């Protein structure tokens, strides 16, 4: 940028079409967050009406995680082939239909299937909306695009909690799911009123359709084996998260089977760049492992160990959720100022200062606890708002939506595993200590993975001939692409 351009406020670099594109995607992401958390809000009512066991009730939450990886792959491939806009609209319709079906569900099986549909739609929305907005905004503002967008999910969760308190006491739990019809109307408006992402349009206009991840896996030479592995992964995940298995060895074996299948898919679809894809899955996995114990078990901690009443719990959770939403936006500014990886590391290091006080302060002063949680979540959870920008930079435009959708949603299985780890540690320690120790230790793993740019570093170690030296989204160099101590002159821009 020229000096004169740098003096212009950042928001004036965006035209009306770019703001409209962002607003549409942000509302879609808000609706995604709204729909996803509804089941957690009404789980006790659903369990009571259907006569479910605790395991069956919990499986309705896990169901969305079981299908997410496939939704990210399928709808991401749609975005790579037919455009980000169509994939985003299709994702919104998919999770809206699933939510509406939950409202009509006559029993457990129907609701479980509906939750699978919601998981697929949510995964597709993440990949398609993120790539749509990032590719629509100028390169120097793409961390802001990512962070601002992801804040919509946290806002949607807060809105869902408020709507729950107004709707369910009067009309019952099913009425909450009937609101799921509204995003479909919104999706139809989107289809006619938003432009296609600029990067995708420039890459594909007038050219033959690209070969997507779906083409490679399910229409290629190994399609039969890959279809069988897809069913095997789905069955293994179901038994792990919804099958009430008591044998830890069997669960570990099924988890290992899923890991082998997902790595196999990444190797087939990414070719020589598979080390980058596998490391990105690990980054996301540990990002969920450090953050989701608090996300999932904080309400339990507040109710059981601090003995807070429901109203106080709601107030504290508001601080937490609002902090995460603000943090996504702050992370966007930090990312464009410091660079994506440096901003991520600095924010996580700052959050580490707060994690111990959050669980050491006790429950005597609710406002102090709320403020500590606000800032801890702002720095620790909110910075994940620029994770789509970080992941997307490792993929070329042709494979970005499916690459982002698949790697993120495979790693997101850590979100299903994290509460279990927290609960297991809490059997030996109190819950607050368990959550603090788990989050504190695993955050350092993410700091190392991102700070050392391990995706590029492992790529350089294993398959250097396919190494990408610069971010595909903003053209900034990858620090892990050259050995320690090498001059910056060693960076030579390459295409993968």
UniProtKB/Swiss-Prot annotation:
Gene3D superfamilies xrefs: MFS general substrate transporter like domains
Record's keyword terms, sorted: Cell inner membrane, Cell membrane, Membrane, Sugar transport, Transmembrane, Transmembrane helix, Transport
A GO molecular function held by the record: sialic acid:proton symporter activity
SUPFAM superfamilies (alphabetical): MFS general substrate transporter
GO cellular component: plasma membrane
Subcellular location: Cell inner membrane
Membrane-related topology note: Multi-pass membrane protein
UniProt catalytic activity: N-acetylneuraminate(in) + H(+)(in) = N-acetylneuraminate(out) + H(+)(out)
CDD domains named among the record's database cross-references: MFS_SV2_like
InterPro entries for the chain: MFS (IPR011701), MFS_dom (IPR020846), MFS_trans_sf (IPR036259), SA_transporter (IPR004742)
Alphabetized Pfam families for the sequence: MFS_1
Residue ranges crossing the lipid bilayer per the database entry: 22-42, 58-78, 86-106, 116-136, 148-168, 170-190, 224-244, 247-267, 278-298, 313-333, 353-373, 374-394, 406-426, 431-451
HAMAP family: MFS_NanT
PANTHER family linked to this entry: CARBOXYLIC ACID TRANSPORTER PROTEIN HOMOLOG, SIALIC ACID TRANSPORTER NANT
UniProt similarity note: Belongs to the major facilitator superfamily. Sialate:H(+) symporter (SHS) (TC 2.A.1.12) family.
Job of this protein: Catalyzes the proton-dependent transport of sialic acid.
Protein name as annotated: Sialic acid transporter NanT
Source organism (scientific name): Salmonella arizonae (strain ATCC BAA-731 / CDC346-86 / RSK2980)
């Amino acid at each position: 940028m020229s000096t004169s351009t740098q003096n212009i406020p950042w928001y004036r670099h965006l035209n009306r079409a770019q703001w409209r594109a962002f607003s549409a995607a942000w509302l879609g992401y808000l609706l995604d967050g709204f729909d996803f958390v509804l089941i957690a809000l009404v789980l006790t009512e659903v369990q009571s009406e259907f006569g479910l066991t605790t395991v069956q009730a919990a499986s309705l939450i896990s169901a969305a995680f079981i299908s997410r990886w496939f939704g990210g792959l399928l709808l991401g491939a749609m975005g790579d082939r037919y455009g980000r806009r169509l994939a985003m609209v299709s994702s919104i319709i998919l999770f809206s239909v699933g939510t509406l079906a939950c409202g009509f569900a006559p029993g457990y099986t129907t609701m479980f299937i509906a939750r699978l549909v919601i998981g697929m739609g949510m995964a597709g929305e993440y990949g398609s909306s993120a790539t749509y907005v990032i590719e629509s905004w100028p390169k120097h503002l793409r961390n802001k695009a990512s962070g601002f967008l992801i804040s919509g999910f946290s806002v949607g969760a807060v809105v869902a909690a408020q709507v729950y308190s107004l709707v369910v006491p009067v009309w019952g739990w099913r009425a909450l799911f009937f609101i799921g019809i509204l995003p479909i109307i919104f999706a139809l408006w989107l289809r006619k009123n938003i432009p296609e992402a600029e990067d995708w349009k420039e890459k594909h206009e007038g050219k033959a359709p690209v070969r997507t991840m779906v083409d490679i896996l399910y229409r290629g030479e190994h399609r039969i084996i890959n279809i069988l592995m897809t069913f095997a992964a789905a069955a293994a995940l179901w038994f792990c998260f919804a099958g009430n298995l008591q044998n830890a060895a069997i669960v570990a074996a099924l988890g290992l089977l899923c890991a082998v299948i997902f790595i196999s898919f990444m190797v087939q679809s990414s070719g020589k760049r598979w080390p980058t894809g596998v490391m990105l899955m690990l980054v996301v996995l540990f990002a969920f492992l450090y953050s989701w114990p608090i996300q999932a078990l904080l309400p339990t901690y507040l109710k059981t160990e601090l003995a807070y009443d429901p109203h106080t719990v709601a107030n504290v959770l508001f601080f937490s959720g609002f902090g995460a939403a603000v943090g996504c936006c702050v992370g966007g500014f930090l990312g464009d100022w410091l660079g994506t990886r440096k901003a991520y590391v600095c924010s996580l290091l700052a959050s580490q200062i707060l994690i111990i006080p959050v669980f050491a302060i006790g429950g005597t002063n609710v406002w102090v606890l709320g403020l500590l949680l606000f800032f801890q979540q702002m720095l620790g959870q909110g910075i994940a708002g620029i994770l789509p920008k970080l992941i997307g930079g490792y993929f070329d435009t042709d494979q970005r939506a499916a690459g982002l959708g698949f790697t993120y949603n495979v790693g997101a299985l850590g979100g299903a595993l994290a509460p279990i780890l927290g609960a297991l540690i809490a059997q030996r320690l109190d819950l607050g200590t368990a959550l603090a120790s788990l989050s504190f230790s695993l955050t350092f793993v993410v700091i190392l993975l991102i700070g050392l740019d391990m995706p590029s570093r492992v790529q350089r170690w294993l398959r250097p001939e396919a190494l990408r030296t610069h971010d595909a989204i903003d053209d900034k160099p990858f620090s892990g692409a050259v050995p320690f101590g090498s001059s910056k002159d060693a960076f030579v821009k390459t295409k993968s």
